[in-house]
Amino acid sequence: MNRRRFIKASLALAAACGTPGLATLFSRNAWAQESDIADGQTRAFDFSVLQAMASELAQKPWGGAPRPLPDTLAKLTPQAYNSIQYDAGHSLWNNIEGRQLDVQFFHVGMGFRRRVRMFSLDPATRQAREVHFRPELFNYHDAGVDTRQLEGQTDLGFAGFRAFKAPELARRDIVSFLGASYFRAVDSTFQYGLSARGLAVDTFTDTPEEFPDFTAFWFETPKAQDTTFVAYALLDSPSVTGAYKFIIHCESSQVIMEVENFLFARKDIKQLGIAPMTSMFSCGTNERRMCDTIHPQIHDSDRLAMWRGNGEWVCRPLNNPQRLQFNAFSDENPKGFGLLQTDHKFESYQDVMGWYNKRPSLWVEPRNRWGKGTVALMEIPTTGETLDNIVCFWQPEKPIRAGDKLNFQYRLYWSGDAPVRTPLARVYATRTGMGSFPEGWAPGENFPTQWSRRVAVDFVGGDLKGAAPRGIEPVITLSSGEAKQVEILYVEPFDGYRIQFDWYPTSDSVDPVEMRMFLRCQGEAISETWLWQYFPPAPDKRKYVDDRQMR
């Protein structure tokens, strides 16, 4: 697997994929009456047409990398590219009076070389017309683009699109599709964070990762009062094609996407990732190694949450490990999973540029039976906040063979918190630090002579208070080492309980330690399950050094 570097905000560079014979798939046309920016020919279109298109495309060889862009676009710097702005007067639904939604397009250029085709679709007649590229759709400002090189190049297409909602119809977008099959959405804070993808291919295998492209979009024209719009997308890559339908609900406090896809495998696929998402975790309450800045925490997401098919709720805090880690959590017909940002307090981040306290969570809710598989989590070492280092997706257990057709239906919730949560006690935070000393004597006049690592897991909610008089029992399981000095502490500021223990190694191994804990009362589970992966230091580092200078 090649390590991927993702540029934050909206500049994740798209990988090179292609669409062979696409012109022939759109060729059964008749001239249409022009209206607004849609200037192409009409063609009957619905989701079944798109499925047939993707199926036909899968029978053809992949077309390879995008052809070169004009030099004036290919050599743009990120700053120059960002200065190119779509002209709001030419927005897709600009002719709808009193509209609640609108769409604008991204310019091709810089690393965005894939020419994505855009179509306007009349939902009543099911007739689609293409929107061709032309320079007058954009304001180039001081980007330094020689627009003479672009005249007449109607096949340049676009790099992607973004959607707006009233009253911010031209100023603050709420949905963005840009680069390969990446897309994002916001909640009421208008702050982008983690990204989703249409599909992941061979993310963690012995072959290079493949980044499928969305190569064409069709937008159903909404009614003026609608706050929901429908978009269809064609996906293409060397190994697979896909027909996608997105029903995007732009609510006041969140964006909900209903997604359905039909996938057609061109070849055998070692690892297929469904509903993939990518995020960033540099440091947090449980991982302090990379927090030598003024910021207490730096992350888009702090945990992987899972609602398993058997009803168990699982919380897995994220790591920024020193070496790449890939973990797979087996399940059957999962009820949901996602990367969550649960801490929304400014003081936890002290960041006036990234505003990590405003970043949304992303929750996946399967809508059909996904069968057996795993929730996959990859954590890549990163030195800072500009690299996305967290990847999560569903991997079906059944191998994908050439000629296979698959169908997945799910919802994506972009919101401050997950739309559902366990009725049991849930993990509030995970903290780690020096062990082997009595709490309240940190570390006292004398440093501990025996090395250990303290772990504190805070639980809130559920029936913790009712269970306390009857006895709360932490059930701790470790893959290696021992848990000692286990304490149960009530913490008034967050009205919950802290379970803390010291982990002592029983060998010189530096392999990751798998930790698991849940709370029990009189034999019954009263909390979700906490999972964590700890990376012990080398044996010669397992000591405390008192480096004070008293003279």
Curated annotation (Swiss-Prot):
InterPro entries: Gal_mutarotase_sf_dom, GH-type_carb-bd, Glucan_biosyn_MdoD, Glucan_biosyn_MdoG/MdoD, Glucan_biosyn_MdoG_C, Ig-like_fold, Ig_E-set, TAT_signal. Predicted to be exported by the Tat system. The position of the signal peptide cleavage has not been experimentally proven. It comes from the Bacteria. One of its GO terms (cellular component) is outer membrane-bounded periplasmic space. GO terms for molecular function: carbohydrate binding; catalytic activity. The gene is mdoD. HAMAP family: MdoD_OpgD (MF_01068). Probably involved in the control of the structural glucose backbone of osmoregulated periplasmic glucans (OPGs). GO terms for biological process: beta-glucan biosynthetic process. It is found in: Periplasm. Residues 1-32 form the signal peptide. PROSITE patterns: TAT. Keywords: Periplasm, Signal. The keyword Nucleotidyltransferase does not apply. SUPFAM superfamilies: E set domains (SSF81296), Galactose mutarotase-like (SSF74650). This is Glucans biosynthesis protein D. It comes from Cronobacter sakazakii (strain ATCC BAA-894). Belongs to the OpgD/OpgG family. Pathway: Glycan metabolism; osmoregulated periplasmic glucan (OPG) biosynthesis.
